Amino acid sequence: MRLENLLLSASGVLKLGCFGLTTQAIWYSKENIKYDGIRSFAPEVFTGDYGMKSDVWSFGACLFELARVEPYHGECPVNSLEVVIISSFPFKAIAGVSEVFVDYVKKCLVKDVNERWSVSELMDVSSFYAE
């Protein structure tokens, strides 16, 4: 899932589309290593052990980009790989964004797939407001 694949209708309905390699196939060639999609890949994708919680990571990356209006760990693919595979995600306060929203995104971007929230947990938004 990438931000580029989220489609919002005039009536506010959000849909997920997949354009694959249709518009920028050259970006994915071996000769031109500018893998744009890497920035939203979950760490486990690189080891081949991925599932629904990998999409949760990608969803969190999309939410972060929407809030920051910039890629969630830089423009450079090398930086993207380092953050996803090696380092921890550097969470910082986002001006104008509620702490509840930031906590929600943090639940998506947990490196350990076993600790990362599931889709069901994320859909139960009331858990963020419970005392």
Name what the model sees in each region.
Residues E31-E44:
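Conserved activation segment of eukaryotic-like protein kinases, specifically the C-terminal portion
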Residues T47-M52:
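Activation segment
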Residues D55:
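Conserved catalytic-loop aspartate of Hanks-type protein kinases
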Residues R68-Y72:
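Structural helix C-cap motif within protein kinase domains
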Residues G96-L109:
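Conserved C-terminal C-lobe helix
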Residues V110-E131:
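Terminal C-lobe "cap" of eukaryotic-type protein kinase domains
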